[in-house]
């Protein structure tokens, strides 16, 4: 199963994340199938590749809870998609 999840980058206590499509059995920082965006929680910056995200969601990829919240804020998913 393909998951849309966060992959950690950055320094200690100064993390940034890339939003990636990965197999759900792969390690968090393992090899990604595709990079779909960027998230910096410290500066509250989000960059998304909307077409690629929509394509992955149409293929049946499941976002994690944190990624789902980012997509709802960016209006890529409806509010009811949140748990």
UniProtKB/Swiss-Prot annotation:
Q: Which Pfam families match?
A: Ribosomal_S16 (PF00886)
A GO molecular function held by the record: structural constituent of ribosome
**What UniProt keywords apply to this chain's record, in alphabetical order?**
Ribonucleoprotein, Ribosomal protein
Record GO cellular component, one term? cytoplasm
Q: Which domain of life is it from?
A: Bacteria
Q: Could you give a single Gene Ontology term from the biological process aspect? A: translation
Q: Gene3D superfamilies given for it?
A: 3.30.1320.10
What HAMAP family would the database entry show?
Ribosomal_bS16
In which family does this protein belong, per the annotation?
Belongs to the bacterial ribosomal protein bS16 family.
**Protein name from the UniProt record:** Small ribosomal subunit protein bS16
Q: Which organism is it from?
A: Thermosynechococcus vestitus (strain NIES-2133 / IAM M-273 / BP-1)
């Amino acid at each position: 199963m393909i998951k849309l999840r966060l992959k950690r980058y950055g320094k200690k206590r100064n993390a940034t994340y890339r939003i990636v499509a990965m197999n759900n059995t792969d390690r968090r920082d393992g090899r990604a199938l595709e990079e779909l965006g960027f998230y910096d929680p410290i500066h509250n910056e989000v960059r998304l590749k909307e077409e690629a995200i929509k394509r992955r969601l149409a293929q049946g990829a499941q976002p994690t809870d944190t990624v789902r919240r980012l997509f709802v804020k960016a209006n890529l998913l409806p509010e009811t998609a949140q748990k």
